[in-house]
Regions:
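Conserved beta-strand segments of alpha/beta enzyme cores
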Residues: 186, 207-208, 293-296
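Class I S-adenosyl-L-methionine
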Residues: 45-203
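Conserved proline-anchored active-site loop of SAM-dependent methyltransferases
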Residues: 147-157, 161-179, 189, 200, ...
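Short loop/edge segments at beta-strand edges and connector loops
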Residues: 210-213, 298-299
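Charged, often flexible domain-edge or linker segments that flank or initiate folded functional domains
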Residues: 23-95, 99, 113, 172, ...
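Flexible, glycine-/basic-rich loop-and-beta segments that form/coincide
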Residues: 307-404
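Long amphipathic alpha-helices with heptad-repeat character
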Residues: 2-5, 9, 13
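Conserved Class I SAM-dependent methyltransferase catalytic core
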Residues: 194, 247-306, 313, 317-319
Length: 443
């Protein structure tokens, strides 16, 4: 029995040895290593930030200041360590809201802000400090409520863009609230301020973000499906030879250049100063009407930005669809009308008073003492409900034009965005191993 048992064990050992010899441990090792590499790769791929807090950017001036400083300190740490922000760190960066709501931090004579004034001077490089101080005039960020309303309107229209442009993006709240149905779109953002633009790059690493003035950005004409954003507004002009003859104020310039970049049938959904619609001079509206159809407009109450920007200013949301040819006759919205109380407003609002989400009154301008009009909020009104009702009244875009493809490929778009500033117009350049010809502003 002992001998038989020994022979059994030896046969079993031979069977095990033969099975082990037939196993390909090299393949198993390669498979395990490949799986580990794929896992590391998935973990290393940075993701665009998703805004889930409806009150992001809200708060008092001191809180905004503290959030801004925390974001800047983190940004400088990330850049020193040459790494991408983690999701938890993106939460900190996303609370940066710019300096439009806290100009006191740059006032050397404000005793209540003396500590913050000194802290900022130490934290920021001289060029960063100068840019931040200069941004207090128009760096007013948009509330998620208003952005969500814009996207709800675009979704109802059936807008399904392949490319999205935000030409004055701040830290990118429009990108952070992009609907899931638009998640495959290629994102292009532009931001003038260095600190803000660098934060945006950390928040949206999959987007193509250019830190520069919009007037210096190279994009092919007729290449963008959808442009969204809150354009800067003020009584000053940018230097761009292409548009010099028109003398556009900054907010009107953003409309003009963006319409050139959007393809025929594409949509522009911008928040702008009420001056675009209400100024007495009709030249800008004539320019826009020759190039785009106004699908609708919503006048926001002056309180719409009070939580996120600590400012009260009357603004409009405009929805435009680019035309291929000028209309035979200029539309009514080029002209001015009056409210029932005799307040001058755009004729669109005269004909559609339900799109004014407040009461138009005479007021003092945010830029001086000259008498101006503003949209006073309705008492106890729910802005979310008002926006939903107004959104339902926006006209549908022309479906045939909406479905047209862009004239520029994504490859051409990318090459134009990455083109060095010193490439001269009407000359050849190599981008990504391919030869391109630069026209006036794009490849």
């Amino acid at each position: 029995q002992v001998v038989a048992r020994q022979e059994h064990y030896e046969s079993l050992r031979e069977l095990i040895d033969r099975e082990l010899r037939e196993l390909n441990f090299g393949d198993l090792t390669d498979t395990a290593m490949a799986a580990a590499a794929q896992l590391r790769e998935r973990q290393a791929v940075p993701e665009n930030y998703r805004i889930t807090d409806p009150d992001i950017g809200a708060g008092g001036q001191k809180m905004k200041y503290q959030n801004n400083v925390a974001a800047i300190r983190l940004l400088k740490t990330l850049e020193a360590e040459e790494r991408q922000a983690s999701p938890a760190e993106q939460d900190v960066l996303a609370r940066y809201s710019g300096w439009g709501g806290v100009p006191q931090a740059f006032d050397a004579h404000n005793e209540k802000w003396a500590k913050e004034y000194e802290e900022l001077k130490e934290l920021l490089a001289p060029d960063e400090y100068a840019a931040a101080r200069g941004s207090t005039l128009n760096a007013h960020y948009t509330s998620p409520l208003v952005i969500q309303s814009i996207y709800d309107t675009l979704s109802r229209m059936g807008v399904q863009p392949g490319t999205v442009l935000e030409p004055a993006m701040g830290v990118g709240n429009f990108f952070g609230l992009l609907p899931q149905r638009m998640g495959d779109a290629q994102l292009y953002g532009v931001e003038l301020d260095s600190i803000t633009g660098r934060i945006a790059k950390q928040l949206y690493p999959k987007a193509n973000i250019t830190v520069s003035g919009f007037e210096h950005v190279n994009l092919p004409d007729n290449s963008i499906d959808l442009a969204v954003g809150n354009v800067p507004f003020g009584n000053y002009r940018l230097s761009d030879p292409r548009y010099k003859q028109y003398g556009f104020l900054i907010h009107d310039y953003f409309f003009a250049k963006t319409l050139d970049k959007v393809r025929t049938g594409g949509i522009v959904a911008f928040i702008t100063s009420k001056g675009t619609m209400d100024k007495q001079d009709t030249a800008v509206r004539e320019y826009l009407a020759q190039r785009a159809d106004l699908l609708g407009a919503v006048r926001l109450p002056s309180s719409a930005f009070s939580k996120t920007a600590n400012t009260e200013v009357t603004t409009d949301i405009l929805f435009l669809q680019k035309r291929d040819t000028p209309p035979e006759q200029l539309p009514d919205w080029v002209q001015l009308g009056k409210t029932a109380d005799g307040i001058p407003v755009n004729r669109y609002y005269e004909q559609h008073p339900e799109m004014v989400l407040g009461t138009m009154i005479w007021d003092k301008s945010m830029y001086g003492n000259e008498k101006e009009t503003s949209c006073q909020p309705l008492p106890d009104a729910d802005l979310k409900e008002l926006l939903a009702a107004a959104s339902a009244q926006i006209a549908m875009p022309d479906a045939e034009r909406l479905a047209r493809p862009s004239r520029a490929s994504l490859e051409e778009l990318q090459a134009s965005v990455n083109m060095p500033q010193d490439v001269r117009s009407f000359s050849y350049t190599v981008q990504g191993g391919k030869l391109y010809y630069k026209e006036s502003t794009s490849l």
